[in-house]
Design a protein with these regions (language model features):
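C-terminal segments that line or cap access tunnels to active or ligand-binding sites in enzymes
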Residues: 2, 9-252
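Acidic, Ser/Thr-rich low-complexity intrinsically disordered segments
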Residues: 253-270
Length: 270
């Protein structure tokens, strides 16, 4: 059972005062290298180079931010209208800063995020889709920023007064950046056959799993997609008489289609 490719391959971590390196070199032994070697044997095994040929198009950056005192949480609460220390839903999803040069988004899930998390601290997640653009406050590309600088940009968009931003980023938070060169590789343009079938025709002893294997009707970027490919692989190769759960047929349900239209227009009438 082969997981071909890998969205998190070559991911690197920085620190509060260090940049996360942008490491794009595909080295022997990884998921992309293995898939390339398999694909060289037969076209039925897909075309990995369609997905990993240009990390400039498939990368983005994320960061975890831990608040260390009571200075930042009020700004989070002001935007999400919920007490982040309540133990209940905080942001209720991601908050996207639409006019951010990095297209910055952030979220705080139900706290504490970790069992051993100190009381009075929050752990949140920040990410930016345009890692090569200068920030609105930090005039550097996101990929060239330390954790502290990413935090400063985020605090700027939270509405923190500019004369307090640097001090708060340095002393009221610890921010760890992560660069992911291939994180959206599965969204790269592709053609039929670029992803191999879960069980290629004629295969009797191996199958492909995960986001770069082809299964019917489902959409990548979900855990369900990976699980469905694994179920299909196991049931097929081991001749297990069980059906893989159907993908929800929303594309054929007029109620779902109408609701999607409303959501895409933010509830505005046509």
């Amino acid at each position: 059972f082969i997981t071909n490719g890998g969205c998190v391959e070559n991911s690197t971590l920085g620190s509060q005062n260090e940049v996360a390196p942008f490491n794009t070199e595909i080295k022997p032994g990884g998921g992309w290298d293995m898939w390339r070697k398999i694909a060289a044997q037969d076209p039925a095994f897909g075309n990995p180079n369609k997905f990993c040929y240009n990390p400039e198009l498939s990368n983005w950056m994320s960061a975890t931010v831990t608040t260390l005192d009571d200075r930042i949480p009020p700004y989070v609460q002001k935007i999400c209208k919920r007490d982040p220390f309540s133990g209940k839903v905080v942001t209720g999803g991601i908050v996207t800063v639409k006019d951010s040069n990095w297209l910055l988004s952030w979220t705080f899930n139900r706290q504490p995020q970790f069992r051993s998390q100190p009381k009075g601290q929050l752990v949140g997640w920040i990410y930016g889709l345009f890692s090569d653009k200068p920030g609105n406050y930090i005039k550097k590309a996101m990929r060239d920023c330390t954790g502290k600088e990413i935090c400063m940009e985020w605090l700027y968009h939270l509405g923190v007064p500019e004369n307090q931003i640097e001090d708060m980023a340095e002393n009221s938070a610890n921010t760890i950046p992560c660069m992911m060169p291939y994180i959206t590789a599965f969204f790269m343009p592709r053609s039929a056959g670029d992803r191999p079938l879960v069980v290629p025709e004629g295969s009797v002893n191996f199958a492909f799993l995960g986001q770069f294997a082809e299964t019917k009707r489902d959409t990548i970027f979900t855990t369900e997609y990976s699980i469905r490919t694994a179920m299909e692989a196991v049931y097929t190769l081991l001749n297990i008489d069980r059906g893989v759960p159907e993908v929800w047929g929303s594309v054929y349900d007029i109620r779902d289609l109408l609701n999607a239209t409303v959501q895409l227009r933010d509830g505005k009438s046509i």
